[in-house]
Amino acid sequence: MPGPTQTLSPNGENNNDIIQDNGTIIPFRKHTVRGERSYSWGMAVNVYSTSITQETMSRHDIIAWVNDIVSLNYTKVEQLCSGAAYCQFMDMLFPGCISLKKVKFQAKLEHEYIHNFKLLQASFKRMNVDKVIPVEKLVKGRFQDNLDFIQWFKKFYDANYDGKEYDPVEARQGQDAIPPPDPGEQIFNLPKKSHHANSPTAGAAKSSPASKPGSTPSRPSSAKRASSSGSASRSDKDLETQVIQLNEQVHSLKLALEGVEKERDFYFGKLREIELLCQEHGQENDDLVQRLMEVLYASDEQEGQTEEPEAEEQAHDQQPQQQEEY
């Protein structure tokens, strides 16, 4: 697989070495890790699945491995959809490639998951990791998508871990790593009330004084029974009306959420296309392309806002030059 910058070996063949700015050469190395084809240019060892690679871990073993390495309390593979665990793995494998202060270890919402995967993408770029992160699939919390990615990441970890000691709790600097909620968990968790407690006779039984020995308890009149049954029927109708209204609200919120998700996926696809175009022309050392890449990989909104005016100024300055060339 070709490297980012290629050079020729003494015999005239392409050996995929990297020539740095100071003229030094980083030799290309080829690795084989558990049947994987992996390549390295002095940074991360890239791992690519092949047909002979069938060794995988079960869902329980892979979660136990994640919890043991980075001291988390995950119970399901789907909880890896927050991206926080991967960010800490990258800090462990390549110290300094990611800032754990910006990682949302208590992420519970999808936009927070995307924020973490954005940081992960930036760290992949810094370490020349070629793996494409399927963010739009992972943040949905589906089992198979997250299982496939963590299986690949386990092989990537085995290829790059050098055995150094690492304290994940200290590296998080006191941030509580709370597992994200299980996907599909109900938002509304209303406590159930016992039928006996809501019955009109229960309150009457509690409030009635103890009968004296020898005295005959008086029976409730027919008027009282009718009024109690009428109030119970009215309360049941009110509850049914509330249930209908809540169901309508839930339905409308689901429709709104689906619309927002479609819009998000649409713009995410556009950004992905821009990213691929920038990567294709990244070797041309175009300043505008570099600034666009910095905006795409910005770790927070403030960085993107501060970089956007500069990119626009550079684009405006370059337009007259391009017109003159044509």
From Swiss-Prot:
Residue(s) carrying Phosphoserine: S9, S218, S235
Renumbered residue ranges of the record's region Disordered: 170-239, 297-326
Phenotype reported upon loss of the gene: Mapre2 knockdown inhibits chromosome segregation. Mechanistically, perturbs CDK1-cyclin B1 activity in metaphase I-anaphase I transition.
Major localization listed first in the record, in broad terms: cytoplasm
Stretches with biased composition (Acidic residues): 300-312
Modified how: Ubiquitinated in an ASB14-dependent manner; leading to proteasomal degradation. Phosphorylated at Ser-235 by CK2 leading to enhanced cell adhesion. Phosphorylated by CDK1 and AURKB during mitosis reduces the binding affinity of MAPRE2 for microtubules.
Keyword Cytoplasm: yes
Any one GO biological process: positive regulation of focal adhesion disassembly
Ranges for region DCTN1-binding: 186-326
Segments of this protein annotated with the region APC-binding: 258-301
Domain EB1 C-terminal: from-to ranges: 235-305
Compartment list: Cytoplasm; Cytoplasm, Cytoskeleton; Cytoplasm, Cytoskeleton, Spindle
GO function terms (MF aspect): identical protein binding; microtubule plus-end binding; protein kinase binding
Modified residues (Phosphotyrosine): Y166
GO cellular component, one term: cytoplasm
Compositionally biased region (Low complexity): 199-233, 317-326
Record's keyword terms, sorted: Cell cycle, Cell division, Cytoplasm, Cytoskeleton, Microtubule, Mitosis, Phosphoprotein, Ubl conjugation
Tissue spec: Expressed during early stages of apico-basal epithelial differentiation but down-regulated in most cells at later stages.
All copies of domain Calponin-homology (CH), residue ranges: 56-158
PROSITE patterns: CH, EB1_C
Subunit structure: Interacts with DCTN1. Interacts with APC (via C-terminal). Interacts with monomeric and polymerized tubulin. Interacts with SLAIN1. Interacts (via the N-terminal region) with BAG1. Interacts with ASB14.
Function: Adapter protein that is involved in microtubule polymerization, and spindle function by stabilizing microtubules and anchoring them at centrosomes. Therefore, ensures mitotic progression and genome stability. Acts as a central regulator of microtubule reorganization in apico-basal epithelial differentiation. Plays a role during oocyte meiosis by regulating microtubule dynamics. Participates in neurite growth by interacting with plexin B3/PLXNB3 and microtubule reorganization during apico-basal epithelial differentiation.
Family: Belongs to the MAPRE family.
Domain writeup: Composed of two functionally independent domains. The N-terminal domain forms a hydrophobic cleft involved in microtubule binding and the C-terminal is involved in the formation of mutually exclusive complexes with APC and DCTN1.
Name listed for the protein in its UniProt record: Microtubule-associated protein RP/EB family member 2
Name of the gene encoding the protein in the UniProt record: Mapre2
